[in-house]
Amino acid sequence: MGCDGGTIPKRHELVKGPKKVEKVDKDAELVAQWNYCTLSQEVLRRPIVACELGRLYNKDAVIEFLLDKSAEKALGKATSHIRSIKNVTELKLSDNPAWEGDKGNTKGDKHDDLQRARFICPVVGLEMNGRHRFCFLRCCGCVFSERALKEIKAEVCHTCGAAFQEEDIIVLNGTKEDVEMLKRRMEERRLRAKLEKKTKKPKTAESASKLGISQDSAGPSKAKAGKSEEADPDPREKKSSLAPRGTASNGSASGKVGKPPCGALKRSIADSEESETYKSIFTSHSSAKRSKEESAHWVTHTSYCF
């Protein structure tokens, strides 16, 4: 049986079976992971940050995502674990001197090498193109190849000298097993931080209660001191309270205050043990006193009066 024109159809043209799964080009996948932002799908440009699962982002895209409070904001696997800017780390990348960028093939007549990367490992010199495993330190943000960390075993960063632990090493764009391990570490780290916050709160409450108890214990002593002061007033206050009564008794009915007696304040020089020459200076001495005959009359007799 044939069709018009004498052609004979084959079985696969008539019977439709299940579609084959399309295979993703590995080179294209690596280029997308290492050269484009996971959130905005734009070309990576500095400052570049990485999350706790090892995915690469543009810092501007992460900030815009966190500031966006609208209900239409897309929440996917790439952003569900990012709750604040503290959940990402800014990377310290080393530039590749052989990288020419878009300037190398402006005419389109040359082969575009997709394996050429913008950044390299500062220790070994491997290019960060996805062919080699790279990781970064969460404490300082320095990026190295996994080979460099294995060959040069140290507990200090090779670039800045910061101390780190094994938990601080995060693999960039790792496999599914790597992502699951990093996710488990992230959850443990966040749970530990919550427990530390809860333990700090009771300590502050206990310190506040201790301060309150100390203030309460200091209160009765002050009250007792106040009662003793009221019961036993200062004798100086007694004298000062008695003084106005005396002045009031010396005062007249019109409200004027009388002068206090000054006899007690006066002091005679005759009672002192000084010499007679010293005593003769003062008017209280006997030599300074005159009789009525020697004293002058208040009316002066002069030649002008006659």
Curated annotation (Swiss-Prot):
Report what the Swiss-Prot or TrEMBL entry states about this protein's PTMs: Undergoes proteasomal degradation, via DDI1 and DDI2. Removal from stalled replisomes and degradation are required for genome stability.
Renumbered residue ranges of the record's region Disordered: 192-306
KW Phosphoprotein (keyword) present: yes
Keywords noted in UniProt: Chromosome, Phosphoprotein
| Principal place of residence | nucleus
**Bias-annotated ranges (Basic and acidic residues):** 226-240
The PTM Phosphoserine maps to: S287
Q: Note the Pfam families from the entry.
A: Rtf2 (PF04641)
Q: State any GO BP term from the record.
A: mitotic DNA replication termination
Q: Where in the cell is it found?
A: Chromosome
| Gene Ontology, cellular component aspect | nucleus; replication fork
The answer to whether keyword Phosphoprotein applies is yes
Q: How does it assemble?
A: Interacts with DDI2; probably also interacts with DDI1.
Sequence similarity: Belongs to the rtf2 family.
Q: What does this protein do?
A: Replication termination factor which is a component of the elongating replisome. Required for ATR pathway signaling upon DNA damage and has a positive activity during DNA replication. Might function to facilitate fork pausing at replication fork barriers like the rDNA. May be globally required to stimulate ATR signaling after the fork stalls or encounters a lesion. Interacts with nascent DNA.
Q: What is this protein called?
A: Replication termination factor 2
Q: Print the organism lineage.
A: Eukaryota, Metazoa, Chordata, Craniata, Vertebrata
